[in-house]
Amino acid sequence: MGVYTYENEFTSDIPAPKLFKAFVLDADNLIPKIAPQAVKCAEILEGDGGPGTIKKITFGEGSHYGYVKHKIHSIDKENHTYSYSLIEGDALSDNIEKIDYETKLVSAPHGGTVIKTTSKYHTKGDVEIKEEHVKAGKEKASHLFKLIEGYLKDHPSEYN
């Protein structure tokens, strides 16, 4: 088994606490509302939403995937960190056992946020991860993030 690690960093004008509430704490409600073509719904299968919780994300008609299951490892509301693993679903190919994600939102000096993400792909056997697979995932995540950011700018009184 191999582990391939990818890091990404981008910025937002939205303050970290507000962004964390929308992007992490209420994502299961917000994303299907603003991007139903990407995510149809999210449901908790086990747990209470905290560490150990298993969620099923059903993708919308605009996605070429059907569903994935996430296992939440940690949610730190004070430090704005979140980690989970993608453990099942058609986004995992026959060559990938799981993908671990860590997200940290850091308050930036200008009042916005620096978003730092780490993805760790755990492969089966000696399989290598294709760069275009990772790039496509980053582009989709970036697009979804921009939708959330746009929603927050259009609705400034929400998630305070």
Swiss-Prot record:
The answer to keyword Glycoprotein applying to this record is no
Check the UniProt entry and state the signal peptide residues, or none.
none
What keywords are assigned to this protein? Allergen, Fruit ripening, Pathogenesis-related protein, Plant defense
Task: Give the record's GO CC terms.
Answer: cytoplasm; nucleus
InterPro entries according to UniProt: Bet_v_I/MLP, Bet_v_I_allergen, Plant_def-hormone_signal, START-like_dom_sf
The UniProt record lists the keyword Repressor: no
MF terms in GO? abscisic acid binding; protein phosphatase inhibitor activity; signaling receptor activity
What domain of life does the UniProt record list for this protein's source?
A: Eukaryota
Instruction: Check the record and name the Pfam families matching this protein.
Output: Bet_v_1 (PF00407)
Residue ranges spanning the membrane: these are none
Q: What this chain does, per the record?
A: May be involved in ripening of fruits.
What name is this protein filed under?
Major strawberry allergen Fra a 1-A
